Amino acid sequence: MPIVSDKQKEATSLIVEQLVQSGIKLVASLPDDWIAPLIDAVDKDDRFKHVPVNREESAIGLCSGAFFGGIPSLALMGASGLTTCIYAITKINYSYHIPLFIFATLRGVIGDPRPHHISNGLYLTKLLDSISLPFLLVEERKTIERIPAAFKHCQAMNRPEVVIFSEAVLLGDA
């Protein structure tokens, strides 16, 4: 794992504490370099059951099943992974009114030098809007504190909700 700065550790700790405040018990994750410190923190924290999965749809299925077991959960993935899950989300979670809380990264925006993520920057939020999937865009540190409210909204609606993090927030620079 790359070296993690003190600012990044602090941002990660703040996010983890918001998960605890939300009552999250299970986290299903897929690797993404922007959220690697968060995945590592959740994995090492006894307050969570962390399940690494190999496909985004597996995280969707696991977290949806956890709902029926009364276990508050989170699917943690990159932006590309989220875009591949749209069918599963609309088929399972929308059809059967299953809440699903998702964290994703905001890739392909100004400042992201990786050309293979440009489509995420262009289309991710528009795609979510097109299927009426609410999201909280976290581009400033103070917005992290809204995570429990987003989780509560997701549960109240019995529908998915996404929290999308900018790289600056995850690095502790915003």
Located regions from the model:
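Thiamine diphosphate
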Residues: M1-A174
